[in-house]
Regions:
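Conserved ABC ATPase signature
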Residues: 4, 29-33, 37
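H-loop/switch region of ABC-family ATPase nucleotide-binding domains
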Residues: 89-90
């Protein structure tokens, strides 16, 4: 193909490595990285390409709680830089802490779309076929499935 990275490409990579505090990982093979480290590397790799939109499928799956929070904070920071972040995520409590807009999909169709007001017990019961309690403590909203 004949393409090799130029000076600007290398500078952008170095800048992104520093921005994401990945210097200690730069020379390691990806099979040596933890799930959280690998996810940060994948996101950084995508950002080097300077996208306007970042589309992610379950970016926090298989991560421990610490790394889930790190990845979600990172994605929130990216969105504050003017990059649109669209993600599929099934952890509603995590989504409620970090997302600005929700699109609830059922069988490939939009069930509801909007802010946290669309996260209702009724919508979630239709969506998951499980009774769910929505708890608003004044500062955060939580969803908890009812146990039989």
């Amino acid at each position: 193909l004949g393409w090799t990275p130029g000076r600007k490409d290398r500078e952008k990579v170095e800048e992104t490595i520093k921005e994401f505090s990945l210097q200690h990982l730069a020379l390691r093979h990806t099979d040596e990285l933890s799930g959280g480290e690998l996810q940060r590397v994948h996101i950084a790799r995508a950002l080097v390409q300077e996208p306007q939109i970042l589309i992610l499928d379950e970016p926090t799956s298989s991560l421990d709680l610490k790394h889930q929070i790190e990845v979600m904070k990172l994605l929130r920071d990216i969105s504050h830089q003017g990059i649109t972040v669209i993600m599929a995520i099934h952890d509603l409590n995590l989504a409620l802490r970090y997302a600005d807009c929700f699109v609830l999909l059922k069988n490939g169709n939009i069930l509801s779309m909007g802010g946290e007001e669309v996260i209702t017990e009724e919508n979630l019961q239709v969506l998951y076929d499980v009774r769910i309690n929505r708890i608003d403590n004044g500062s955060h909203i939580y969803v908890v499935p009812e146990m039989e």
